[in-house]
């Protein structure tokens, strides 16, 4: 597969890479769980030690936002970026109240594909795209951010991305960047359940 897919729609990987480059690979990366977690591990670069906070394989959706708040207090000298999917963000959405109260300067990047992406990928690959309980009904995240007095920007196209990231980084305090990415993007390669490395799948 392509290292960095570049179809008509934004991909999760290119958003992650763009944020990494804009922060000169020096930010602390916090991940939630799902495709966003794997894309972050794949496309975010580091120039310093102790630069990633993740729950690994525990599957704790909703981990990212509160962990990022903690990281801003633990390392106030560094930029903290958290990547989340729309499913994970809605599991701990109330933490925006903590960010507002504490003025925690978390840079939140929402990779919104309107799906529980990781589960959808499995349903696509192993269940003939019979999507069950994976499509997401999302609220207007710009209105939610406004309600919490958090600056926010929604990006729909590749041309808008760099400017929005620069705005996020330049903002003194928290910021929510919603990137509307391709709905059926996949994280490849992957090993099928019970399979070995030599059975690795390269495409969906």
Task: Show the residue positions of the predicted features.
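Thiamine diphosphate
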Residues: 39-204
